Swiss-Prot record:
This is Ubiquitin carboxyl-terminal hydrolase 10. It comes from the Eukaryota. Belongs to the peptidase C19 family. The gene is UBP10. The active site is at residues 371, 691. Residues 167-208 are annotated as: UTP22-binding module. PROSITE patterns: USP_2, USP_3. PANTHER family: UBIQUITIN CARBOXYL-TERMINAL HYDROLASE (PTHR24006), UBIQUITIN CARBOXYL-TERMINAL HYDROLASE 36 (PTHR24006:SF758). Residues 144-171, 211-220 have a biased composition (Basic and acidic residues). Residues 172-195, 226-241 have a biased composition (Acidic residues). Pfam families: UCH. One of its GO terms (biological process) is regulation of protein stability. Deubiquitinating enzyme involved in telomere and HM loci silencing, which is the repression of chromatin structure which leads to a stop in the transcription of nearby genes. Targets histone H2B for deubiquitination, thus helping to localize SIR2 to the telomere. At silent chromatin, including telomeres and the rDNA locus, not only maintains low H2B 'Lys-123' ubiquitination (H2BK123Ub), but also low H3 'Lys-4' and 'Lys-79' methylation (H3K4me and H3K79me, respectively). It catalyses: Thiol-dependent hydrolysis of ester, thioester, amide, peptide and isopeptide bonds formed by the C-terminal Gly of ubiquitin (a 76-residue protein attached to proteins as an intracellular targeting signal).
Length: 792
């Protein structure tokens, strides 16, 4: 018996280590802490200290006897002081921490189940030792007892229901839950239930230490919780942040990011401006949430989405779209060599022919800042009728009107070098990539004396000046400019009807035009008494609408060179286009121009002056097309002038591949539909800086980008997505109902001879046609000398 009595304390110490750990805290805790402290806090810290200090088996036995006495006292006195309640194990401490309303019942239940729980916990000595180490560290860092208890006994949501049932009497499975989850899931439960189940017992702690304890709990919960819980919490925090950040960012996005808002609205309809605001506000939240949830999105994906949006917008047309069935009623690009247009002109050829189809033009050398001339020349020489006309000049068809010193002849020689096929002889072969247009650049003073080859100029102004010079060279002296072949290619006729609101008189005018100028933004305002800086329309005339007026330099085109599609005002545009980032549709501006417009009298008594009643009054103006040009030049006014300086409007532009103007024509007998031929692009911030390039359609139907000396293949889709277009060239599609001019045999033979001469001019590398011209000149001189001899 003596041996058993001596071994029994050792066995009890090993088997009931958690019990001795808790019992030792009583004496230490009763000496150090106040009676007002929470029982679970005092008992828990005492357990840790007593376990570290006790080494005698007799002390362990004494503590066991004292615990039994205190348990009986607690059962007999349910309303006794809470400082006397001593948990027997970690599970009993759990019950004390998680129960608020029925703490006495929890104490009684814990006393009854202490033996079972202690045996279950004692079978895991590593966990108890790790608990002791953690408790010791926590005591050094923080003097509060409840902090260490939270570190280990935080419940999870799944076990809370079991613990509530344990308070009512179903506490049998608590020990199993603790043994399974004490080292795995307690940390997960801390982050979830810190504000749900532990808030009520925390209210009994001193107010001075509540804030510090809450901060420590958050730190411990984040350090103990598993990776999955951390990710879930971060996702929840991100979602909360998204909702708050989105509310703060939305007002700024509504002011600054108008491009996305407008692009969404225009997808619905360009005319439904009132519906835009409602639809955009709903759709704006989707990209914000997607960017927040997905984190950093792929920039390539964003670019592709933007490109798709731009393409969808650009493919839309306010005017009736040209469908495949409609296109079958027209001669397609380069389909019939005998296609001479819808105006029955016998002087123009609208298709390239078989010989040009196999040729590739060359680039043009940049002399420093001559990209504006190169882009304009490339756009003009990719018009089939212009190129055929220039080759006819080289073959001497227009020797009676065009001299060799003219700008037209210089341009013809430049075009010949551009289209010259590559020779098999390397000595005679020129550069296969580009040519030097030095002779054409040297004639810049004759084209426009206000321009300089050492300074960046306006490419559209150069194009119009070159067109004007070609028209002047092609008309004999004493003849009208509308008799020129240039008028057959670019010329149109506009009819304007102005009705006086005072007397009801109607004024009708007809004016030729060579391009259509579109403003991109501003208010509609008509000033008929303005000078040449604005586009005046007083019922009898219209000035030019190029970027800088051609009235001073080219009087031949100053009276009727172009039509301002913003109704005569430099500030006119669609009222909806107030944002600089809003995409501009040329179809909408054309429609706005041809709609009836009210000309109002302003405060300065400026308005329409009636020729009949001689009053300055209100009037209604209506415009229509009498003659649609074979080649339509659309100019976009992207530059504004403030005295001596200019600025560029950052306005994205959309334009269709096919443009329908039938509804704006006076006669509806023939449909008026156009196909895109060339796009000249300006890249830069101002008129005096930047760079010009040209997207042109090749004779074989493909598209190419001409960047001075460099030529790159480009797709038709990329051409339509170009946001920096400055001016565009459209060619009119000839309906198949129009008879082709093949009736007379003389015309047919003339066409064959002219075609053979053009092929000869292209194929022969050097000036063989010039030798023929020199022989003719020698014959003329010989005839003159012969006449002089006979007269003598």
């Amino acid at each position: 018996m003596t041996t058993q009595e001596s071994i029994k304390p050792l066995v009890d110490r090993i088997l009931s280590n958690p019990l001795q750990f808790n019992a030792a805290m009583i004496s230490n805790k009763s000496n150090n802490n106040d009676t007002s402290a929470a029982p679970e806090n005092s008992s828990y810290i005492v357990i840790g200290k007593q376990h570290n200090n006790n080494s005698n088996s007799t002390a362990i036995a004494a503590t066991a006897e004292s615990k039994q006495i205190k348990e009986n006292n607690l059962i007999d006195r349910p309303n006794g002081k809470k400082t006397n309640t001593v948990p027997k194990s970690m599970a009993e401490a759990l019950l004390l921490y998680t129960s608020k309303n029925d703490k006495d019942a929890a104490d009684a239940t814990g006393a009854k189940k202490s033996a079972e729980l202690s045996t279950e916990l004692s079978t895991e000595p590593p966990s108890s030792s790790s608990e002791d180490d953690k408790v010791g560290k926590e005591e050094e860092e923080e003097g509060e007892i409840f902090h260490e208890a939270r570190d280990y006994v935080e419940p999870r949501k799944a076990s809370l229901k079991e613990r509530d049932n344990a308070d009512k009497g179903d506490g049998e499975d608590i020990g199993e839950d603790i043994g399974e989850d004490i080292g795995e899931d307690i940390g997960e439960d801390i982050g979830e239930d810190i504000g749900e189940n532990l808030g009520s017992p925390l209210a009994t702690i001193d107010d001075s230490s509540n804030e510090n304890e809450k901060e420590k709990r958050k730190e411990l919960s984040t350090s103990i919780s598993s990776d999955d819980e951390i990710e879930d919490d971060e996702d929840e925090d991100d979602m909360d942040y998204d909702s708050s950040a989105m509310e703060k960012e939305l007002p700024e996005e509504e002011e600054n990011d108008s491009s996305s808002k407008i692009s969404e609205g225009e997808k619905k309809s360009l005319y439904q401006d009132l519906m835009e605001n409602s639809t955009v506000e709903v759709n704006r939240y989707e990209p914000v949430n997607n960017t927040k949830e997905n984190g950093n999105r792929n920039p390539k994906g964003e670019e592709e989405e933007e490109e798709e949006e731009e393409l969808k917008h650009k493919s839309r047309s306010i005017t009736p779209p040209v469908t495949i069935s409609n296109l079958s009623n027209f001669y397609q690009f380069n389909e019939n060599i005998n296609d001479r247009g819808s105006l029955n002109s016998t002087r123009i050829v609208k298709n390239w022919g078989d010989k040009f189809t196999n040729l590739k033009p060359r680039g043009l050398l940049n002399h420093g800042v001559t990209c504006y001339t190169n882009a304009a020349v490339q756009a003009m020489l990719h018009i089939p009728s212009i190129q055929h006309y220039l080759f006819d000049i080289l073959m001497g068809k227009y020797d009676s009107t065009i001299s060799k010193n003219s700008v037209s002849y210089t341009l013809a020689e430049t075009s010949k070098k551009m289209w010259l096929p590559v020779s098999k002889n390397p000595r005679k072969n020129v550069s296969a990539s580009y040519i030097n247009p030095k002779h054409l650049i040297s004639r810049l003073d004759d084209i426009n004396c206000m321009m300089s080859e050492w300074q960046q100029e306006d490419s559209h102004e150069y194009f119009m000046s070159l067109m004007s010079r070609l028209q002047e060279d092609s008309v004999p002296k004493g003849h009208k400019l509308i008799e020129s072949i240039i008028y057959d290619i670019f010329g149109g006729l506009l009819k304007q009807i102005v009705t006086c609101k005072s007397c009801g008189s109607i004024s009708k005018t007809e004016q030729p035009f060579y391009d259509l100028s579109l403003h991109l933004k501003g208010k509609k305002k008509l000033d008929p008494n303005s000078d040449l800086s604005s586009d005046s329309i007083n019922g009898t005339s219209a000035t030019t609408s190029t970027t800088t007026s051609n009235a001073a330099t080219k009087p031949s085109l100053s009276s009727s060179s172009s039509v301002n599609l913003n109704n005569g005002s430099p500030f006119a545009a669609a009222s909806d286009l107030s944002s600089a980032n809003r995409r501009f549709s040329i179809e909408k501006s054309i429609k706005d121009f041809f709609n009836p417009e009210l000309i109002k009298v302003d405060k300065e008594q400026k308005g329409y002056v009636c020729e009949k009643c001689h009053k300055t009054t209100n009037a209604v103006k209506h415009s229509s097309i009498l003659r649609a040009p074979e080649t339509l030049l659309v100019h976009l006014k992207k530059f504004r002038f403030n005295g001596t300086s200019s600025s560029k409007m950052k306005q994205a532009v959309s334009y269709p591949m096919f443009l329908d103007l039938t509804e704006y024509c006076e006669s509806k007998e023939l449909p008026v539909k156009y196909q895109l031929l060339s796009v000249v692009v300006h890249e830069g911030r101002s008129l005096s800086s930047g760079h010009y390039i040209a997207h042109c359609k090749q004779p074989d139907g493909s598209w190419a980008t001409y960047d001075d000396e460099y030529i790159n293949i480009i797709s038709e889709r990329d051409v339509l997505k170009e946001p920096n277009a400055y001016y565009l060239l459209y060619t009119r599609l000839t309906p198949k109902s129009v008879p082709l001019p093949l009736a007379k045999s003389a015309m047919a033979t003339g066409n064959v001879t002219s075609k053979s001469k053009q092929e000869q001019a292209v194929n022969e590398p050097n000036n063989r046609p010039l030798k023929i011209n020199s022989k003719k000149n020698n014959r003329k001189k010989w005839k003159k000398n012969k006449k002089r001899k006979f007269t003598k």
